[in-house]
A protein has these predicted regions:
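Acidic/polar loop patches that form or flank catalytic/metal-binding clefts of enzymes
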Residues: 9-15, 49-56, 119, 157
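Generic alpha-helix detector with strongest preference for long hydrophobic helices that associate
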Residues: 19-24, 29, 58, 76, ...
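Glycine-rich, small-residue loops and helix-cap segments
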Residues: 79-178
Length: 178
């Protein structure tokens, strides 16, 4: 931050905004629904000699080869995506509306407008956890600034910021649709 100020940037410190209680559940639902649709589209266009043509095929393949494909971790995310509502369902559309309002209208757009700034900056995310073969990845509750831009679909640029205990961390620069 000091280097940016020295280079002429005006820094305005902003406290993060709150999210509704059902925000993270809604964003996971949208992610699961979209993941299934777009992965199916990608896999269906794979070369003919690749037998996995859909997420359902991939889950079946992983189950048939569990000793290798699931030797350490399962496929909970794939399985929850298979069960996710279709993108034309009211459940999906309601969740999408909630996360767009939270991350766009009440999030990035509001922060830019209310603080009269052109760009938001913050740590991209927490330090990545070490692989834990017993408990799985244990992430902190804080998702990082990059998540707001990722969920909103707005521009986000992440650049290296340094390291913490030898693990690289980044800083995100994001802005609105205009």
């Amino acid at each position: 931050i000091a280097r940016m100020e020295t280079a002429g940037a005006t820094i305005v410190r902003i406290e993060s905004n709150e999210t509704p209680p059902d925000f993270w559940g809604a964003s996971r639902l949208v992610l699961d629904s979209e993941f299934k649709v777009f992965l199916d589209a990608y896999l269906s266009g794979s070369p003919a000699d690749i037998p996995v043509r859909s997420l359902a095929d991939l889950v079946a393949f992983n189950n048939e080869n569990a000793e290798v494909e699931q030797a350490i971790f399962g496929q909970d995310i794939f399985e929850s995506s298979l069960e996710a509502p279709e993108m034309d369902s009211d459940t999906y559309q309601d969740a999408l509306a909630l996360i767009r309002k939270t991350t766009r209208d009440d999030g990035i757009d509001a922060l830019l407008r209310d603080h009269d700034v052109q760009v938001l900056m913050g740590p991209s995310g927490p330090v990545s956890p070490r692989v834990d073969v017993v408990n799985g990845d244990v992430w902190p509750a804080w998702a990082g600034a990059g998540s707001m831009a990722a969920i909103s679909g707005y521009p986000n640029l992440t650049v290296p910021m340094g390291t913490v205990a030898g693990v690289p961390v980044g800083v995100s620069f994001m802005s609105g649709r205009d």
